[in-house]
Amino acid sequence: MEINEVIREIKSKFRLFMNGVISQSLREKGLQYRLIFGIELPRIKEIAAQYEPNHELAQALWKEDIRECKILAAYLQPVESFYPEIADIWMEQIHNTELADYVCMALFRRLPYASQKAFQWMASENRMEVYMGFRLMTHLFALLGAEMNERSRDEFIDQATAAMRSDDLIVKQAALSALERYASCGEEQSAEVQHLLDAGA
């Protein structure tokens, strides 16, 4: 089946599960897409399970200005063909925290260069990149623990400290979440974070 035919088939499945109430609620929360079907994540994952991971299909889905297509793309994108420059392109096109969270969970945390991207984005001046950087660190701490060299640890703490002093609530919350996950990795990390918070970060 051609990619365009597969996408038409996927959209027909989306229409079956369309939820107008959720769609309207998401728009009221500020999500801006050409189309929002209002389908919840478990159902999108069920649809994803019906297809083999496919780079061309995932890239075509990502180009659609449709919420569910972009989320599905993250589940169907093979890791091995998702190069760092493509990750940067996707990151530039993520404009809300919902999509950032889903893409991070489904794809970015599995990338072999995930930690490099996390540090790159945490140091960005773009708020959504900073948010993604901390969300990615949260996932990496959960998956891999707090194994970092001293330089990386110091950089993470410095970036988190700066973010905690930010007036941007989403950045601050993402940094706090990453710090909490880091603290859960061991007594040393817990004490380090507690000292940071006590100091008024």
Where in the sequence are the language-model features?
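Alpha-helical scaffold domains
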Residues: 1-201
